[in-house]
């Protein structure tokens, strides 16, 4: 029996070595990040109403295996609907009108089996960012940003994630909102790898996005699309449930990165089921490491 055990030792050692290598590979798994304006629950949307879309929205998030999701325009009932359908995700955020449940959330979601939230919070895009429900500059609406420091359970490494939705009317609100976001990313995220998701209501050549990505600014971010090794899908993300002609559609939904994150893949997921859309925006997905 002792001889048999000694003969098996090399094979056991090899098997354990392979297991160790496999574990090392697993800890190097990319992180899939999605930004998704899900369109607020508007009864006037007819067949595009949330009641007809909520199952498909949840399935899309799960199908694309998103580890982190930044959502915009989520009303409280929509938050509850998604929480019920995506129990493997934790959500962070509050309603922008009162800091509780009123108004749209810019909710952050993360997979509970992949990440732990070490810290999180939110602030308003206004001159008084800590005042709940405050409206900034010339903005038409209250605007909020939600952030978290997430620790990867596979590696122990941390990253800073922020999700927001800039104003659709106020020029100054977008400009000053971006300044505030960049300052907060630096203040809260420091030297951590940074991911910023959101609907910026601005096209890539706009002053707003140039402000975000200006390399002369030490706080600048990088548009993930511009550095991805593989880019997939159209160059637009807003289509208004398909009503905008292709040549007039625009890319206003972004994922930005900073501090050494490598963007492996970037995709705009312009899918439909027949004539049915997930939202009036497309989800955007990146894979980073």
Predicted regions and their residues:
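Positively charged n-region of N-terminal signal peptides that target proteins for export
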Residues: 1-4, 18
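Sec-dependent N-terminal signal peptides
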Residues: 4-13
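N-terminal, active-site-proximal structural segment of metallo-dependent hydrolase catalytic domains
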Residues: 15-85, 98-104, 179, 289
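Active-site-proximal beta-strand elements of phosphoester/diester hydrolases
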Residues: 30-42, 119-123, 157-166
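Catalytic metal-binding/acid-base residues of hydrolase active sites
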Residues: 39, 75, 165-167, 200-201, ...
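Structured beta-strand-rich core segments of catalytic domains in phosphoester-bond hydrolases
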Residues: 68-158, 268
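Active-site neighborhood of phospho(di)ester-bond hydrolases with catalytic His/Asp-centered motifs
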Residues: 70-72, 94, 195-199, 223-226
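Metal-dependent phosphoester-hydrolase catalytic domains
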Residues: 172, 176, 183-194, 202-289
